[in-house]
Curated annotation (Swiss-Prot):
Residues 560-572 have a biased composition (Basic and acidic residues). This is Protein SDA1 homolog. The modification Phosphoserine is found at S236. It holds the Pfam family SDA1_HEAT. Keywords: Nucleus, Phosphoprotein, Protein transport, Ribosome biogenesis, Transport. The modification Phosphothreonine is found at T234. Residues 488-573, 662-712 are annotated as: Disordered. PANTHER family: HSDA/SDA1-RELATED, PROTEIN SDA1 HOMOLOG. GO terms for cellular component: nucleolus. Its main location: nucleus. Belongs to the SDA1 family. InterPro entries: ARM-type_fold, Sda1, SDA1_C, SDA1_MD, SDA1_N. The gene is Mys45A. It comes from Drosophila melanogaster (Fruit fly).
């Protein structure tokens, strides 16, 4: 029997493909034959596109593989495939459709097809009822756009694609719209389309889509915290245990497989170490980039009131609206009465509803708007007919709301809630005390006098702000702590530098500095100096013949006093607050300076304030506060714990095996020596023990027992 020849080029396309890639010119005729064959098969296939054609499948992939060798001949090849997909996208056989898509991707990877044309076609193919194809296209679209923006962002292409995406989100096909939203969100998370245009397309179209899946996907994008938590969990689970792998490799038997596994674990450990050292890349939250947050919040609230979606979708609406209100300080007064309806202990997901109420609170919301929420929580949660957990949740929610809007709390309600500080259940008691602590810092006047506590310096410095008032700092808080070491600013009272009440410092200036008031004072000083000099001259003329030595000494002392007065004119007396402002303007703070500033600010929070202000001159007495300063006991860190452990080991015997010999320099027994011997020295004896017969073992045991008996 004659074997068939498998190397015939017209029928063996893989062999012809290999030869063409090596030498395109020599096999151009064969390629032309195959291309004409492709055109004829394509015309036949167009008559019945729903039928699979294996010959066309093979020849399409063949032409796509070698198209770069004959660009002039294959110029119309991508267009023919694109037209076929556009005209018969939903009718084509799934296998043939996948074949054409893969061929176009192959041509796109070789830069034989414009990116915009091919991506627009692929977005249209998302309407096809083929899940595998849609997933494949999504992966390719994201990868292709990522590669195009790898070196620098192609703004023109991105703008065109985003405009096309805008229309795709409005598509009537829910699957295409959902896939388009997924692609945009994935590109945003990969920092490719992380601009405001992408965010606002999702905000204006996705969040108001009639398709529930698109709506939920868009709302999750603006919430977007669960996925980050999941990534952190997976990272912690997949952490490489290099130390354990090294120990296992040392103990276990050495094999090639285990050696390869150890090398792979080492590579993973090095990679993880580099990843930890690299600066983390943060995704800027999309909710900050919304152009019209007020309009978006109002639209979502209107949609929420009219929707009949599941309760989970309503919770997403509430979450996004509350975040918009809290982040952008919006006014949406109808939101608060709406959310009050859900504030019942038996309400499903009531803790999340309380969270949304706190998120929607900010300082610019009038207290009269939020006060009904606090009263509802107090009436429904903070009552003794409920369990202690419900009461504690209500108090905690009240604290979170008041933390963002302190003026919403009334004096009577606050004092009633403060009475739970002595409640029998610890959870309720601690929650009430946390609320008291909050108002000790914010508005202590609302508390009962016995609940206000001893005022600290930080509380004394804090000004009670009215509605809508902003706290503006004109210097770095705590910069007074750096005045003592300042070279340009001289503190007159070096004995007491802990407080900023009435302390005065001298600030050195150059000759050209100073205001008009200082110039007037300098002029007056100069006039007085001139008068003094005239009087000195007259006196010196009268007494010139009497004592020449005294006149010389007077001239010298006059020169010294003039220098001292000139230096004094260059000094300007400031209080400590003004000196801190001067220091912030004339000095660049280092990390050590900021550490000292933070320590000084922390010190103010634990230092009791004075009942009356200190006097201006502070050199006459020592501050009582500097003696009675109380610091919180800090938790021991690892270094301090190790120091304590080492100190306890100094006068203690070491744990472990003890040498029972009276003289440590005398010889050891054979049994003790055997423990430290190399196994090679004991191998022969161990082998002889294994080979012993039962009778030999009996004799050896009898001999050993007799020897032990004699030793007694």
């Amino acid at each position: 029997m004659v074997r068939p020849n498998n190397n015939q080029l017209p029928e063996n396309l893989p062999q012809l493909q290999n030869l063409i890639k090596r030498d395109p010119e020599s096999y151009s005729d064969e390629f032309h034959i195959q291309y004409q064959h492709f055109l004829s098969l394509l015309e036949v296939f167009a008559l019945n596109p729903s039928e699979e054609n294996k010959s066309l499948d093979d020849i399409v992939m063949f032409v796509a593989q070698v198209a770069q060798c004959y660009p002039a001949v294959c110029e119309e090849f991508p267009k023919r495939l694109s037209d076929l997909l556009k005209n018969y996208a939903t009718v084509l056989d799934p296998a043939m459709r996948n074949c054409f898509v893969k061929a176009l991707i192959l041509l796109r990877n070789k830069n034989l097809v414009p990116a915009l044309d091919i991506l627009e076609l692929f977005f249209q193919l998302l309407r096809c009822p083929d899940k595998n194809l849609r997933t494949f296209l999504q992966t390719h679209i994201v990868t292709d756009i990522k590669n195009m923006n790898a070196k620098h962002k192609d703004m023109k292409l991105n703008s065109s694609l985003q405009a096309f995406m805008y229309s795709m989100l409005k598509d009537a096909n829910p699957k295409a719209a959902k896939m388009s939203a997924d692609i945009m969100i994935e590109l945003y998370k990969k920092n490719i389309w992380n601009d405001s245009k992408t965010v606002n397309v999702i905000a204006t179209v996705g969040c108001f889509s009639k398709v529930t899946k698109v709506l939920v996907t868009s709302l999750k994008f603006f919430l977007g915290h669960d996925e980050e938590d999941e990534e952190e969990d997976t990272d912690s689970e997949n952490e490489v245990d290099l130390k354990g792998a090294l120990m296992a490799n040392r103990v276990n038997k050495k094999t090639k497989k285990r050696t390869k596994q150890l090398a792979q674990i080492k590579k993973q450990a090095v990679k993880a170490q580099k990843k930890k050292k690299n600066a983390p890349a943060f995704n800027f939250s999309g909710i900050h980039l919304v152009h019209n947050p007020q309009g978006m919040a109002e639209g979502l609230f209107k949609q929420l009131q009219a929707t009949n979606e599941r309760f989970e979708v309503k919770l997403m609406h509430l979450d996004v609206i509350s975040r918009l209100i809290g982040i952008h300080d919006l006014f949406l007064f109808g939101f608060y009465p709406y959310i009050t309806r859900f504030l019942q202990p038996h309400q499903r997901q009531v803790t999340r509803v309380l969270q949304f109420a706190a998120q929607a609170s900010h300082e610019l919301v009038p207290g009269d708007i939020i006060e009904p929420i606090l009263k509802t929580i107090a009436n429904n949660f903070i009552t003794e007919r409920n369990s202690s957990d419900v009461m504690a949740i209500g108090l905690n929610a009240t604290r979170e709301i008041c933390m963002r809007c302190p003026l919403a709390m009334g004096e009577d309600l606050l004092q009633d809630l403060a009475m739970y500080k002595t409640y029998k259940e610890k959870s309720v008691m601690m929650a009430a005390r946390s609320l008291i602590t909050l108002y000790r810092e914010q508005l202590p006047a609302l508390l009962h006098k016995k609940d206000r506590g001893r005022q600290t310096e930080a509380q004394a410095e804090r000004k009670v702000r009215a509605y809508g008032e902003r706290e503006v700092h004109d210097t770095v808080l705590g910069a007074e702590a750096l005045l003592k070491d300042s070279k340009t600013i001289d503190i007159e009272s070096e004995d007491d530098t802990d407080s900023n009440d009435g302390e005065w410092v001298n600030v050195a200036h150059s000759d050209g500095e100073g205001g008009g008031a200082d110039d007037d004072e300098e002029d007056e000083d100069e006039d007085e100096d001139d008068d003094d000099e005239d009087e000195d001259e007259e006196n010196s003329n009268d007494e010139e013949n009497e004592d020449e030595d005294n006149s010389d000494e007077g001239v010298e002392s006059g020169e010294e006093s003039a220098k001292a007065k000139k230096e004094k004119k260059d000094m300007r007396i400031l209080n400590q607050k003004e000196a801190a402002q001067e220091l912030a303007l004339t000095r660049i703070f280092t990390d050590e300076d900021f550490k000292r500033i933070n320590a000084a600010n922390l010190k103010k929070t634990v230092t009791s304030a004075r009942k009356r202000p200190l006097e201006q001159d502070r050199a006459e007495f020592v501050k009582l506060n500097s003696i009675e300063m109380i610091y919180k006991k800090r938790k021991h860190d690892k270094e301090s714990r190790l120091e304590t452990v080492q100190a306890g080991r100094q006068d203690r015997e070491r744990f472990g095996w003890k040498d029972g010999r009276v003289n440590e320099h005398c010889s050891k027994t054979n049994r003790e020596k055997r423990k430290t011997k190399n196994f090679g020295m004991l191998r022969h004896k161990a082998r002889s023990k294994v080979k012993k017969s039962f009778k030999d073992k009996q004799q050896a045991l009898r001999k050993h027992l007799l020897h032990q008996k004699k030793m007694k």
